[in-house]
Amino acid sequence: MLPLVVDGLGFSVREQWLLKDVSFSLGAHDRTFIVGPNGAGKSILLKICHGLLSPTTGTVRWASGSFREQRQRQAMVFQKPVLLRRSARANVEYALSVRGVAKKDARERADRVLEATGLTAIAHRPARVLSGGEQQRLVLARAWALRPQVLFLDEPAAHLDPAATAAIEDVIQQVSNAGSKIIMVTHDLGQVRRLADEVLFLHQGQLLEQAASGDFLAHAKSQEARAFVEGQLLW
């Protein structure tokens, strides 16, 4: 289904343009991170690419498949975990049942991802009583179990302590190594250094740079991107 081609994308609310003429193309293999200051339009762009929002102008095109087929090949994890009032295991198995996976296969897939994410010992516990880091690992495990070609992540480690963040990043690395394309929003340049292959930099709804992560961090071209990398405040 890749590459993903975004052309002339705009998004407005009550005549205020939150994204303006955004264009880029993403290949199948790199981990792509969308970065920028608060209010830059990062999460909106992610939701449009996933099909949760419709653009005001422009197009989002995948290489192949109908809209339904494209959505079946994607998964998304939000900053705040969305969990059912069920056990951790049941949360994973239910997502698989919705996708039409047979019960036996769903159990086996759930076993694999719960083990890989370090959640086997607490798989029987109600999902909503888990810690914040455990809940976020669970929603990542649930998404991974779907075997997405593309996994969208909206600041999955926001507000977590360093140990929980490291666990989340380990899962992201595993999902990437298993073959999923990662498209992730973050404000954390440390995460960019540790995980990203490619960076899209947004500022005030405009895409100012698309570059390899090392080039972006060391040699950002725009004044705004350089200021962001240096830790200056942007608005």
Each PLM stretch: what is its role?
Residues 151-154:
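Catalytic Walker B motif of ABC-type/P-loop ATPase nucleotide-binding domains
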Residues 126-130, 134:
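Conserved ABC ATPase signature
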Residues 186-187:
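H-loop/switch region of ABC-family ATPase nucleotide-binding domains
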Residues 104-122:
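Conserved ABC ATPase "signature" region
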Residues 192-194:
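A short, surface-exposed alpha-helical micro-motif characterized by mixed small hydrophobic
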Residues 50:
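Helix-to-loop junction immediately C-terminal to a conserved catalytic motif
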